[in-house]
Amino acid sequence: MSSKEQNTPNEQASDEIETEQAKNQGADTAAEAADQRDERIAQLEAQLAESQGGVRDAQLRAQAEIENIRRRAELDVEKAHKFALEKFSNELLPVIDSLERALEVADKSNPELAAMIEGIDLTMKSLLGAVRKFGVEVVGDTNVPFNPEVHQAMSMMESEEVEPNHVMMVMQRGYTLNGRLLRPAMVAVAKSKG
């Protein structure tokens, strides 16, 4: 045997140790790589879950916004239908006022005017009936509590017959359209004597 072929037992042990160490280093490197891979997988899964949560949240917000837009559109259409007659109704109020004034100043004692007065009265009643069909209501009762939302106080008068802060006299009737004020009633409000 040549000297190269002969390995001393120390050399053989040293070779085995190096081989063992190389195997251990390879195993350690493989374990580290596996750990890094597992960490990266965990990070990516966390990012995926977070982005999916964000997508779900965005989807829910979008659905809620669509529902809100739909509801607002329905309300707008409902209001448009309900109050479409507001301008037209406001234009009719002076006509009703004129008919009322004509009845107030008409000479009811003159028999020659009786037919005309009756015609004006029927015309006014017919016009009021027509506007009521479309939601126009009269505000003009007396002996009711003064309500600043539908009454405009023109004066205050002392009275023993009418309770204080109640409508004593209506100077001009007011009107509402489906609960919305078209014109306040101009009234005199009672106050206690004192």
UniProtKB/Swiss-Prot annotation:
Q: Which InterPro entries match?
A: GrpE (IPR000740), GrpE_coiled_coil (IPR013805), GrpE_head (IPR009012)
| Listed GO MF terms | adenyl-nucleotide exchange factor activity; protein homodimerization activity; protein-folding chaperone binding; unfolded protein binding
Compartments it resides in? Cytoplasm
Instruction: Provide the primary localization.
Output: cytoplasm
Q: GO:BP terms for this protein?
A: protein folding
Recorded hits in Pfam families, A to Z, give:
GrpE (PF01025)
Q: Which HAMAP family match?
A: GrpE (MF_01151)
Q: How does it assemble?
A: Homodimer.
Among PANTHER family, the record links this protein to: GRPE PROTEIN (PTHR21237), GRPE PROTEIN HOMOLOG, MITOCHONDRIAL (PTHR21237:SF23)
Return the protein name.
Protein GrpE
